[in-house]
From Swiss-Prot:
It comes from Influenza A virus (strain A/Duck/Czechoslovakia/1956 H4N6). Residues 286-483 form the RdRp catalytic domain. This is RNA-directed RNA polymerase catalytic subunit. GO terms for biological process: DNA-templated transcription; symbiont-mediated suppression of host gene expression; symbiont-mediated suppression of host mRNA transcription via inhibition of RNA polymerase II activity; viral RNA genome replication; viral transcription. The gene is PB1. RNA-dependent RNA polymerase which is responsible for replication and transcription of virus RNA segments. The transcription of viral mRNAs occurs by a unique mechanism called cap-snatching. 5' methylated caps of cellular mRNAs are cleaved after 10-13 nucleotides by PA. In turn, these short capped RNAs are used as primers by PB1 for transcription of viral mRNAs. During virus replication, PB1 initiates RNA synthesis and copy vRNA into complementary RNA (cRNA) which in turn serves as a template for the production of more vRNAs.
C-alpha cells in the first residue's frame, strides 16, 4: 500500500507529525542465521557490569557464579549491577508506607490465583524451550513432553490438575538422582532410488531413552534457550531474547501475578494497562504535577532511558523484594514465590545453534555446535568472535553458559516495574525533606520523571538525587540518552505527550493491510483496524475513507477477486465472471466473490455477510452459509474471534473482530514437507493428541477439552456419556434396540481393556 505521507499531514500542527519520523513503514528487519554471537554478547556484558562482585561455585551443577549484590558502588557514570539489599528493602517499606495494605491485599489475591490456576495455563505462549529434546517447541507440546517424562519417572503429573501440583512435581524432580527421558534422533542412510537410480539420503526418526544424572537434569531445568529478537525497528544491531523451559515458567507466572496485582494499585505504573487506559493514568500524574507547580515552582520532565535494564537487574534482589512483600504470609506461599528468583540466580543460557563455517575453495559447510565452543581451536574465528569465546569459556558447561546476574528480556516485567515505582515514590516531599520533589511513570524499563522545584538549582539537585537513588538498587539512568524539557512535552512508551497525548498514528501503519488468514477473517480484520484507528488514533474521516479504498484494492489483489465486471484477468476471473453473470442481485456478492464494496466509514462495525444478507440471491445465501459444504473444515467459530495484529513496536497484540462463519472461513492445511524431518515424531504425537481431543469433543459437544471432568479420566467420562446418550436416544426412539445393545457392548469392552491394562 503506497500512501504519500504528506497527504495525511496537510492540516496537522508540526508536533503531531513527529510520528512520521519513526521507522515504521516497510518491512522490519529480521535476523538470519545463528543467535550464538548475540547471546555471548549478553552473557559477557552482564558479567562485565557486575565484575567487582564475588565469585562462587554452584555445588550442584559446578557452574561458576558471580554475585554483585551489596558490591562496591560505582564511582562514575558506568552502568552497574551492584544493588544494595538494605536500600531495596527500605524502598519497599516506603512504598508500603505510602500505600497501606498494598502488599497484604496483593498477596491475598495471588494466593487465590495460585490455588485455582490449572496447569493448562502453561500451554499459552509460543516457542518454549523443551528440555527433553533440548530445543524449542510450541508451548503445548513442551508441556506434554515434560508431563510424559515426569510420569514415566514416577511423579504424579497430571495435565488437567492444578498448576501448583505440577510445580510440586518440578521440585521433586530436582531431588531425583536421575531422570529418564525419551529423545528423538535422526538416522541418515544413503540409498539408491529405484526410479531415478540416483543416490539419495533417507532420514528416519527414532525415539530412544536416555538417562540424565542429577547434574545434567538440573542444568537443563535451569536453562533458558536463546533466540534473536526479530522485527525490531530502529536498531542497527540485533539482540538476544530468552525462552525459559517448563520448570521455570509456572513459578515465574505466579511471581508476575503478584507483581501485576501490585502494579494495578500503583498510579505511577504503566503496566499492566495499555491503550487509552494507560494514557488516562499518565495524564493524571502529569496533571497533578502541573497543578501544583503553577505559580511558585518550576516543573521539568525527563524522558528517561535506562542503560541495559535487564542486564543490571538481579534475581537476588527480586528474592529480597518477594521476601519482604510476603513477610506475613503462610510459609508455603512464600516458598512458591521465592523459587523463581532462586532458579534465575542459578540460570544457564543456552548458546543457540553455534556457528556455521564454509570453505569457499572446497565448497564445504560445517556447523560448529555451541557444545564445541569450549574446546575448539580459536584460530578459525575472526578477532571479535575469538574475544567473545575467550571471555565466555570459564562459564561454559555442556554448551550452556552460567549466567547468574542479570535477567533475560521480558521475564519479570511487572516485578521490575514495582522496583522502579518504589524509587519514583521516594520523590514525595515527606521523603525528600527539601524544596524539590518528584513523581513519574514507570513501565518495565521505560520511565518519565517529573521534577518540581522553586528554581533551576533545585531541579538539578532533584534529578541528581533521583539518579543516585536509582544506582543504589541497580537501575542506571543513562545521562546520554535521557533528555529534559519543560513539563508538557515528553515521550513515554512511544506515547508523545504535548499538553495531552498526540496520536502516534505511524505506529499503527503495519497493522493496515491484508492479514493473510482467510478471505472471511481478512475482510473483517481490515475494516476493524480502520474502525479502531478512527476511535483511538485520530484517523480522520477523509483519511479513513482513503485507507478503506486502499484496503479493498489490496484485498482484491491478494485474493484475485476483482469485480465480476472488471477487465483485469487473473486465475480466478473466469469463475468469478460466470458467478457475476448468473447472479440476479449483484450487490449481494461478497467482495471475495467478485462483488462490489458496500463499506463506508459509517458501517465498518457490521460484518460483510450481515451487511449484504438482504441483498443476496437465495441460492447464494444457501451456498455461502452452509455448514455441510464438503470443501470446508470448519473450526467452531465463536461470534467474536481474535486476530493477532502487528503494531510497530511491542508485542503483537490481540484484536477482536466479528466472525461470521461462511464458506470463506477456510483453514489452510499443514505443509506436508514436515513429514521428512526430525519433527515427524512430534507431529505424530500432535495428531494423536488432536484425534483424542476431537473424539472427546464429539462426546461433549460444548466442552473445552482442557478442563478436567470431575476426577474421572477422559475415557471414563466418554464411556459414561456414551451410555447416557444411548439410553436417551433409545428411549426416545431415535435408535433401534440392536444399535443400543451394540453401543453398550462396546462400552463394556473398553472398560474391560482398561482393567486388564
Amino acid at each position: 500500500m503506497d500512501v504519500n505521507p504528506t497527504l495525511l499531514f496537510l492540516k496537522v500542527p508540526a508536533q503531531n507529525a513527529i510520528s512520521t519520523t519513526f521507522p515504521y513503514t516497510g518491512d522490519p528487519p529480521y535476523s538470519h542465521g545463528t543467535g550464538t554471537g548475540y547471546t555471548m554478547d549478553t552473557v559477557n556484558r552482564t558479567h562485565q557490569y557486575s565484575e567487582r562482585g564475588k565469585w562462587t561455585t554452584n555445588t550442584e551443577t559446578g557452574a561458576p557464579q558471580l554475585n554483585p549484590i551489596d558490591g562496591p558502588l560505582p564511582k562514575d557514570n558506568e552502568p552497574s549491577g551492584y544493588a544494595q539489599t538494605d536500600c531495596v528493602l527500605e524502598a519497599m517499606a516506603f512504598l508500603e508506607g505510602s500505600h497501606p495494605g498494598i502488599f497484604e491485599n496483593s498477596c491475598l489475591e495471588t494466593m487465590e490465583v495460585v490455588q485455582q490456576t490449572r496447569v493448562d495455563k502453561l500451554t499459552q505462549g509460543r516457542q518454549t524451550y523443551d528440555w527433553t529434546l533440548n530445543r524449542n517447541q510450541p508451548a503445548a507440546t513442551a508441556l506434554a513432553n515434560t508431563i510424559e517424562v515426569f510420569r514415566s519417572n514416577g511423579l504424579t503429573a497430571n495435565e488437567s490438575g492444578r498448576l501448583i501440583d505440577f510445580l510440586k512435581d518440578v521440585m521433586e524432580s530436582m531431588d531425583k538422582e536421575e531422570m529418564e527421558i525419551i529423545t528423538h534422533f535422526q538416522r541418515k542412510r544413503r540409498v539408491r532410488d529405484n526410479m531415478t537410480k540416483k543416490m539419495i539420503t533417507q532420514r528416519t526418526i527414532g525415539k530412544k531413552k536416555q538417562r540424565l544424572n542429577k547434574r545434567s537434569y538440573l542444568i537443563r531445568a535451569l536453562t533458558l534457550n536463546t533466540m534473536t529478537k526479530d522485527a525490531e525497528r530502529g536498531k542497527l544491531k540485533r539482540r538476544a531474547i530468552a525462552t525459559p523451559g517448563m520448570q521455570i515458567r509456572g513459578f515465574v507466572y505466579f511471581v508476575e501475578t503478584l507483581a501485576r496485582s501490585i502494579c494495578e494499585k500503583l498510579e505511577q505504573s504503566g503496566l499492566p494497562v495499555g491503550g487509552n487506559e494507560k494514557k488516562a493514568k499518565l495524564a493524571n500524574v502529569v496533571r497533578k504535577m502541573m497543578t501544583n507547580s503553577q505559580d511558585t515552582e518550576l516543573s521539568f520532565t525527563i524522558t528517561g532511558d535506562n542503560t541495559k535494564w535487564n542486564e543490571n537487574q538481579n534475581p537476588r534482589m527480586f528474592l529480597a523484594m518477594i521476601t519482604y512483600i510476603t513477610r506475613n504470609q503462610p510459609e508455603w506461599f512464600r516458598n512458591v514465590l521465592s523459587i523463581a528468583p532462586i532458579m534465575f540466580s542459578n540460570k544457564m543460557a543456552r548458546l543457540g545453534k553455534g556457528y556455521m563455517f564454509e570453505s569457499k575453495s572446497m565448497k564445504l559447510r560445517t556447523q560448529i555446535p555451541a557444545e564445541m565452543l569450549a574446546s575448539i581451536d580459536l584460530k578459525y574465528f575472526n578477532e571479535s568472535t575469538r574475544k567473545k569465546i575467550e571471555k565466555i569459556r570459564p562459564l561454559l558447561i555442556d554448551g550452556t553458559a552460567s549466567l547468574s546476574p542479570g535477567m533475560m528480556m521480558g521475564m519479570f516485567n511487572m516485578l521490575s516495574t514495582v522496583l522502579g515505582v518504589s524509587i519514583l515514590n521516594l520523590g514525595q516531599k515527606r521523603y525528600t525533606k527539601t524544596t524539590y520533589w518528584w513523581d513519574g511513570l514507570q513501565s518495565s524499563d521505560d520511565f518519565a520523571l517529573i521534577v518540581n522545584a522553586p528554581n533551576h538549582e533545585g531541579i538539578q539537585a532533584g534529578v541528581d538525587r533521583f539518579y543516585r537513588t536509582c544506582k543504589l538498587v541497580g537501575i542506571n539512568m543513562s545521562k546520554k540518552k535521557s533528555y529534559i524539557n519543560r513539563t508538557g512535552t515528553f515521550e513515554f512508551t512511544s506515547f508523545f505527550y504535548r499538553y495531552g497525548f498526540v496520536a502516534n498514528f505511524s505506529m499503527e501503519l503495519p497493522s493496515f493491510g491484508v492479514s493473510g488468514i482467510n478471505e472471511s477473517a481478512d475482510m473483517s480484520i481490515g475494516v476493524t483496524v480502520i474502525k479502531n484507528n478512527m476511535i483511538n488514533n485520530d484517523l480522520g474521516p477523509a483519511t479513513a475513507q482513503m485507507a478503506l479504498q486502499l484496503f479493498i484494492k489490496d484485498y482484491r489483489y491478494t485474493y484475485r477477486c476483482h469485480r465480476g465486471d472488471t477487465q483485469i484477468q487473473t486465475r480466478r476471473s473466469f469463475e468469478l465472471k460466470k458467478l457475476w453473470e448468473q447472479t440476479r442481485s449483484k450487490a449481494g456478492l461478497l467482495v471475495s466473490d467478485g462483488g462490489p464494496n458496500l463499506y463506508n466509514i459509517r458501517n465498518l462495525h457490521i460484518p460483510e455477510v450481515c451487511l449484504k444478507w438482504e441483498l443476496m440471491d437465495e441460492d447464494y445465501q444457501g451456498r455461502l452459509c452452509n455448514p455441510l459444504n464438503p470443501f470446508i473444515s470448519h473450526k467452531e467459530i465463536e461470534s467474536v474471534n481474535n486476530a493477532v495484529v502487528m503494531p510497530a513496536h511491542g508485542p503483537a497484540k490481540s484484536m477482536e473482530y466479528d466472525a461470521v462463519a461462511t464458506t470463506h472461513s477456510w483453514i489452510p492445511k499443514r505443509n506436508r514437507s514436515i513429514l521428512n524431518t526430525s519433527q515427524r515424531g512430534i507431529l505424530e504425537d500432535e495428531q494423536m493428541y488432536q484425534k483424542c481431543c476431537n473424539l472427546f469433543e464429539k462426546f461433549f459437544p460444548s466442552s473445552s477439552y482442557r478442563r478436567p471432568v470431575g476426577i474421572s479420566s477422559m475415557v471414563e467420562a466418554m464411556v459414561s456419556r456414551a451410555r447416557i446418550d444411548a439410553r436417551i436416544d433409545f428411549e426416545s426412539g431415535r435408535i433401534k434396540k440392536e444399535e443400543f445393545a451394540e453401543i453398550m457392548k462396546i462400552c463394556f469392552t473398553i472398560e474391560e481393556l482398561r482393567r486388564q491394562k
